UniProtKB/Swiss-Prot annotation:
Localization, UniProt: Periplasm
Membership in a protein family: Belongs to the peptidase S45 family.
One Pfam match: Penicil_amidase
Subunit structure of this chain's protein: Heterodimer of an alpha subunit and a beta subunit processed from the same precursor.
Keywords linked to the UniProt accession: Hydrolase, Periplasm, Quorum sensing, Signal, Zymogen
Protease keyword on record: no
InterPro entries recorded: Ntn_hydrolases_N, Pen/GL7ACA/AHL_acylase, Penicillin_amidase_A-knob, Penicillin_amidase_dom1, Penicillin_amidase_N_B-knob, S45
Coarse class of the protein's main subcellular location: periplasm
Protein name, entry field: Acyl-homoserine lactone acylase QuiP
Catalytic activity: an N-acyl-L-homoserine lactone + H2O = L-homoserine lactone + a carboxylate
Top-level taxon of origin: Bacteria
Other facts: AHL-mediated signaling mediates quorum sensing in many species of Proteobacteria, regulating hundreds of genes, including many that code for extracellular virulence factors.
Its job: Catalyzes the deacylation of acyl-homoserine lactone (AHL or acyl-HSL), releasing homoserine lactone (HSL) and the corresponding fatty acid. Possesses a specificity for the degradation of long-chain acyl-HSLs (side chains of seven or more carbons in length).
Length: 809
């Protein structure tokens, strides 16, 4: 599978291939690689089926499963998931358990140590045990379908997976709960940000840290939150190792991208008088599927390893999900001391022994390694797991919600069967194990529900690590689900989410302080409010590449307290730089905010953003190779950034002064330098003819296979981190695209067949499959495919060719 956003994406489906540098397809197998493809026609007996099942596929390989029982449909879903995505399933399963080194070798060991400490298996066990007998039975049947594939094809695995020499284990029902917990972990905030904040605090101190960790444009800086760290020696053993492991995990976990959006249009805003729903997700792991069985039909996006359609349409209700950026991960600094061989931590003035559990790592090509993981009352000590020799100093404990008595897995199934918005809302309220914006619609109504489990903190905001020895920062249970934000049929006639802050200041519960920037959501709101909508306008919205940040930047340039000082600062530059700054200033004032691939002004605008970050922060956080700079850039991608916050305000920030010069600089002086630097950088990268510049020549889509070989591209890309059609890059590092909306779906209730969608990465992870990376053209051209619900329309979309699965003996 390949992605339009990542030149390194395929290994995130077969992550072991990336870690182990998988062999080239040419000559790496002794058998015909076509044998690794299960048939798509004919008759195939499978032990475990009760009755015959039909599987048809559409032009891009989306399966339609037709069965006489829901159990047989789930069995077949397991078989089909494994047929197309066994590499994804195996590697994410190993990643979630902290066992990737068994397949990939020692290079994966640091991530394994981190995942063993986090211990998702404990969460998965809690979640599975709390599920109803009905759901457990569904998961068991699904697992048998996966194992039917493994039994038949374990010696004919896809070539990139087979190259690892690893024999996959048979699937267990509990493994699906583990995949769900990995998804939950990836969609949670803000562990990575807290780790990065500590790295930054080591560089600049806790007094300057608030300027680097803003929450939102209209929120005050987190000064009180940073006061928790005042006076502490923040030299934490193993911190940089934890930081690198967390960042590596983020690269490997294809369930960890939090970007996405939802939009529901009420009948009064629709041209046809019927509701519409549109959604996109930046997760690269989605797999479209359709199930038709007695008393159950649904089509939409699933994740291989999970027997569920997580967002889609069932003939009556459409539902979608995106990250709400909920903060349910807290880091605690623990005071430690060692006495002999025993390790203790301080709790409200008293020393208590840590809990110890032993973990054994089976590393490919090496002897087993046995290590201890230490835990406090808050959770596992991450730096102990990464090999830091803990003595008298700080440990880093991670606390996450417990999932005992959690009915989330039942709730997702109930949601997929809901027949109206009211029932969808009821089901969504029971989703507690994962923090999401759930948006849903039927023909006449729309709704929204925030799901999840959010801690009640006695003090603090959870944005930065807390002193674990001080009970003032402990959790007191979880927020009452009745306080979770929701809405139904709002008077404005639309609901839009794009990872922005979804609650007002002073709301009655702590949801998060790690929101994404507001511009994507603001653009969606503006488009949704402008006249009547239909499916064509929603397609245009999903491909929109206009940024509202450019207008805010212009407003800042022309503000009463900035306009004259900025012009003076430009005039004070040396002659050559002055001319460049003047040109950049005038062109940015005229820029219309359309970040199209062929735009010269868009290129200049993005160059200015990049250069301003370096001019403002690099003197204190650099060099660019330093851990501090890498942490700063990473946090800029995870939530509302200090880069944006300083451009739009923060005139009194200590970061405006360039510590490398004798004089004291202010904001106008640094902005003037940044304007000139944008032109200079553009000349180096794009040439001297500045009118011929093109944003897409700096910023492109590329597709590569598991070996790093280019499949397609580079193709010029428009957009950036603030456009609805997102094409984010590392602000302060380079213009390489980090994520885009991989999956898109639209449901138009005025149509006889309401659901249409596309998936950029293609259905299959097997490089020899015709459905490998075959979503690229449709994604580029906005060619949505219909997924019909009425049997008389199946042949038009899925054709006549079918694979008939029959009970085996």
């Amino acid at each position: 599978m390949a992605s339009p956003a990542f030149s390194h994406f395929l290994p995130r489906f077969g992550v072991a291939a990336a870690v182990a540098s998988a062999l080239s397809l040419a000559g790496c197998q002794s058998w015909n690689t076509q044998d690794t493809l299960p048939p798509t026609s004919g008759v195939q007996p499978l032990k475990g089926l009760a009755q015959n099942v039909s599987v048809r596929r559409n032009a891009v390989g989306v399966p339609l499963i037709e069965s006489s029982s829901f159990h047989d449909a789930l069995f077949t879903l397991g078989y089909v998931h494994a047929s197309d995505r066994i590499g994804q399933m195996v590697t994410l399963h190993l990643l979630a358990q902290g066992r990737l080194a068994e397949m990939s070798g020692a290079d994966a060991l640091e991530v394994d140590r981190l995942m063993r400490a986090i211990n998702l298996k404990k969460s998965a066990d809690e979640l599975y045990k709390a599920s109803s007998p009905r759901i457990k039975r569904f998961f068991e049947v699904y697992a048998r379908g996966v194992n039917a594939y493994l039994f038949r094809y374990r010696d004919k695995l896809p070539p990139d997976l087979a190259a690892q020499g690893y024999t996959p284990e048979y699937w267990k029902a509990e493994d699906s709960a583990l995949i769900f917990c990995l998804l939950n972990f990836g969609q949670s905030a803000n562990l990575q940000e807290e780790i990065n904040a500590l790295v930054l605090a080591q560089k600049v101190g806790s007094d300057k840290l608030p300027w680097l960790t803003p929450s939102y444009p209209d929120e005050p800086l987190p000064l009180a939150e940073a006061d928790k760290l005042k006076g502490l020696n923040l030299t934490v053993p193993g911190l940089n190792e934890v930081s690198r492991a967390i960042n590596r995990l983020a690269q490997l976990n294809s369930l960890g991208t939090r970007g996405g959006s939802n939009l529901a249009i009420a009948p009064q805003r629709s041209r046809t008088g019927r509701s519409l729903l549109a959604a996109d997700s930046h997760l690269q792991a989605w797999y479209y599927t359709q199930i038709r069985a007695p008393k159950y039909q649904a089509a939409g996006a699933s994740i291989a390893g999970l027997p569920a359609i997580l967002q889609g349409f069932n003939g009556k209700v459409a539902w979608s999900m995106s990250s709400v950026e909920g903060d349910n991960q807290d880091l605690f600094l623990e005071k430690l001391k060692r006495q002999g061989n025993a390790l203790y931590y301080q709790n409200n003035g008293k020393w208590q022994p840590v809990t110890v559990r032993n973990e054994t790592y089976f590393v490919k090509g090496q002897r087993p390694i046995r290590e201890a993981v230490y835990e406090t009352r808050h959770g596992p000590l991450l730096n102990s797991a990464l090999g830091a020799a803990l003595g008298n100093g700080f440990g880093l404990a991670l606390q996450t919600p417990e999932l005992k008595d959690d009915k989330t897995l039942d709730a997702f199934f109930d949601l997929s069967r809901a027949q109206n918005v009211e029932k969808a809302s009821d089901a969504s309220r029971e989703i507690r194990a994962i923090a999401l914006n759930m948006v849903f619609a039927d023909a006449s109504n729309i709704g929204w529900q925030v799901t999840g489990r959010f801690p009640n903190r006695r003090e603090g905001e959870g944005l930065l690590p807390s002193p674990g020895w001080d009970g003032r920062y402990d959790w007191d249970g979880y927020a009452d689900p009745m306080l979770h934000p929701y809405d139904q049929d709002p008077p404005q006639g639309w609901i839009a989410t794009a990872n922005q802050r979804v609650i007002s200041q002073g709301y009655g519960m702590q949801l998060s302080n790690s929101w994404h920037a507001p511009e994507r959501a603001e653009r969606m709101a503006g488009l949704a409010s402008s006249g009547k909508q239909d499916n064509r306008s929603l397609i245009a919205l999903q491909y929109d590449q206009s940024t509202l940040f450019a207008a805010k930047l212009k407003k800042m340039f022309e503000a009463p307290g900035m306009a004259q000082p900025l012009k003076q600062a430009i005039e004070a530059l040396p002659d050559t730089e002055r001319a460049k700054a003047r040109e950049a200033y005038s062109r940015l004032l005229a820029f219309d905010g359309k970040v199209s691939a062929g735009s010269a002004d868009a290129a200049l605008y993005e160059l200015f953003l990049q250069e301003s970050a370096k001019q403002i922060f690099l003197d204190k956080l650099g060099p660019e190779s330093s851990d501090a700079w890498q942490a700063f850039v990473a946090n800029g991608n995870l939530s509302y950034s200090a880069q944006a916050d300083h451009l739009l305000g923060q005139e009194d920030s200590p970061f405006w002064d360039d510590s490398r010069t004798a004089q004291k600089e202010d904001k106008p002086a640094i902005l003037a330098r940044s304007l000139a630097a944008a032109i200079s950088s553009g000349e180096q990268l794009l040439g001297a003819d500045r009118k011929a510049w093109q944003w897409g020549k700096l910023h492109s889509y590329q597709w590569t296979n598991a070996n790093g070989r280019q499949i397609r591209g580079p193709l010029q890309a428009g957009g950036d981190h603030n456009t609805i059609n997102s094409a984010a890059y590392r602000w302060g590092q380079d213009f390489a695209i980090t994520d885009t909306p991989a999956l898109r779906l639209i449901v138009d209730f005025s149509l006889s067949e309401p659901l249409m969608g596309l998936n950029s990465s293609g259905q299959s992870g097997n490089p020899v499959s015709p459905n490998y990376a075959n979503g690229i053209d449709g994604w580029l051209k906005a060619q949505y495919l219909s997924l019909p619900m009425q049997p008389q329309n199946f042949e038009r979309s899925y054709g006549k060719t079918r694979l008939t699965l029959v009970p085996g003996k």
